[in-house]
Amino acid sequence: MKNTKKIALAGVLTALCFVFLYVGSLFQTMDLSAAAIGSIVILIAFIELGKKWAFYIYVSSAILSILLLPYKSPAAVFALFAGFYPILKESLNRIKPIFLSYVARIAVFNVALVLLVLVFKKLLAIEADYAKLEMAIFGLANITFLVYDFALERIAATYFTRLKPLIFGKR
């Protein structure tokens, strides 16, 4: 793909990612869903343009979201986890045996989750101790992450087999 086409596609994907995050900011119950949909845009960028361009799209979308969104939760989730995970996932998938690959994926998610909790505690100035609730949330979040990880794999496979030929033609 020529460089001008890459730049144009990167601009369109950045705008699309920002629009999804903006919708998640407007409807605050959709903040996690918007970040997950934004990560699908990054996944498509990774497939079509490669790691470097996908990273540029992630960074530009995250910066735009942090600066412009009225409600920052989708921007925080996207910037601290959902945006970079599709780029990192390819490297994590190559770890053998598969058990260690899953351990690495869950470790990356848990580091991001701890960062998100710390950011939200600072932003919301929460002082109360909710240790039991936090442990339950971490457990449910890890289960949700495994579903998200599986869904990303299925979405990538569907994109390769069905959507890419429709959108870009057979190459």
Model-derived features: positions:
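Membrane-helix interface "capping/anchor" motifs
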Residues: 45-56, 93-99
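Mid-bilayer segments of alpha-helical transmembrane spans in multi-pass integral membrane proteins
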Residues: 71, 106-122, 142-150
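Interfacial aromatic-anchored transmembrane helix boundaries in multi-pass membrane proteins
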Residues: 22-31, 62-91
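Membrane-interface helix termini and inter-helical loops of multi-pass transporters
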Residues: 120-133
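Short helix-perturbing small/polar motifs within transmembrane alpha-helices
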Residues: 78-114, 118
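Hydrophobic transmembrane alpha-helices
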Residues: 1-47, 52-53
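Hydrophobic alpha-helical transmembrane segments
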Residues: 7-12, 33, 55-59, 75-76, ...
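Alpha-helical transmembrane segments and their cytosolic interface
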Residues: 3, 134-171
